[in-house]
Amino acid sequence: MKQFRIRKDDKVVVIAGKDKGKIGKVLKVLPKKDGVLVEKVNMVKRHMRANPYRQQPGGIIEKEMPLDISNVMVMCDACAKATKVGYRYTEDGKKVRFCKKCNEIIG
């Protein structure tokens, strides 16, 4: 299985596409599609039929669609910049992610 440097609840910035420059939180990582769902980014309108069994109303709804994982970059909380992510081990042997710009540990 593929390993991505982006995880759920990471703060990311979109670096390519129609929403370039927008910042959002990762809602879901889709490894089979090489994609991510980012909160309030890549919004589309869908015409939904009402489903009484699920108590779903019909109408036009707005929802997020997946972005390719290569079009987003992790944003460091410490330096507030889009950054590459590296891995290293702490003194107690735990593997952690860190910001390659400021060397701070990422959540």
Swiss-Prot record:
Family: Belongs to the universal ribosomal protein uL24 family.
Subunit structure and binding partners: Part of the 50S ribosomal subunit.
Keywords from the UniProt entry: Ribonucleoprotein, Ribosomal protein, RNA-binding, rRNA-binding
UniProt cross-references to NCBIfam families, sorted A to Z: rplX_bact
Highest taxon listed in the record's lineage: Bacteria
Gene Ontology terms: biological process: translation
Record CDD domains: KOW_RPL26
Protein name: Large ribosomal subunit protein uL24
SUPFAM superfamilies the record matches: Translation proteins SH3-like domain
Assigned GO CC terms: ribonucleoprotein complex; ribosome
InterPro entries: KOW (IPR005824), Rib_uL2_dom2 (IPR014722), Ribosomal_uL24 (IPR003256), Ribosomal_uL24_CS (IPR005825), Ribosomal_uL24_KOW (IPR041988), Translation_prot_SH3-like_sf (IPR008991)
Purpose of the protein: One of two assembly initiator proteins, it binds directly to the 5'-end of the 23S rRNA, where it nucleates assembly of the 50S subunit. One of the proteins that surrounds the polypeptide exit tunnel on the outside of the subunit.
A molecular function (GO) term: rRNA binding
PROSITE patterns xrefs: RIBOSOMAL_L24
